[in-house]
Design a protein with these regions (language model features):
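Active-site nucleophile/metal-coordination loop of metallo-enzymes that catalyze phosphate/sulfate
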Residues: 2-52, 59-122
Length: 122
C-alpha cells in the first residue's frame, strides 16, 4: 500500500533532511568562515570575499524561481551573473515554516537543536 506525500511532486520521493550538506543551517557559519571569523570554516565552499551580503527571499523555492524568474528581476540578474548561470540551492529546514527556517539560519542549528518548529498566532 502506498500513499501520496503532501508537497512531493509525482515521481519524486520524500527525503529526510540533511543539515550537514548544502543546508540553510550552514550558510551563516560558512559566511563567517569566508570572513575569517575564528572557529568557523567555509563548509559550503563559498570562496573568499572581503564583504558578504546575504539576501533572504522567504517563500519561493528553486523550482518556483526557475518557473517565474521574470517576476524577480533582482534574482534573475544574480543568477545571470554566476559563471554557470545558477545560484547554489540550499535545503531549508523541516518543517519549512518561516519561523523554523529563520531560527535555523540564525543559529546554524537544526530544528531539533534550536527547538523552533513553528509558531502560534493569537
Amino acid at each position: 500500500m502506498s500513499a501520496a506525500v503532501s508537497g512531493v511532486a509525482p515521481g519524486e520521493q520524500a527525503r529526510l533532511p540533511d543539515y550537514t550538506a548544502g543546508s540553510l543551517a550552514q550558510l551563516l557559519p560558512s559566511v563567517a568562515g569566508v570572513l575569517d571569523v575564528p572557529g568557523h570554516v567555509d563548509s559550503l565552499g563559498l570562496g573568499s570575499a572581503p564583504r558578504v551580503c546575504t539576501v533572504l527571499v522567504d517563500g519561493p523555492g528553486a523550482r518556483l524561481l526557475a518557473e517565474r524568474g521574470g517576476h524577480a528581476p533582482f534574482l534573475r540578474r544574480a543568477v545571470a551573473a554566476q559563471p554557470d548561470g545558477v545560484l547554489r540551492e540550499l535545503r531549508t529546514a523541516v518543517p519549512s515554516t518561516t519561523a523554523t527556517a529563520l531560527a535555523t539560519l540564525g543559529t546554524g542549528c537544526a530544528p531539533g537543536q534550536h527547538g523552533v518548529v513553528g509558531y502560534t498566532a493569537f
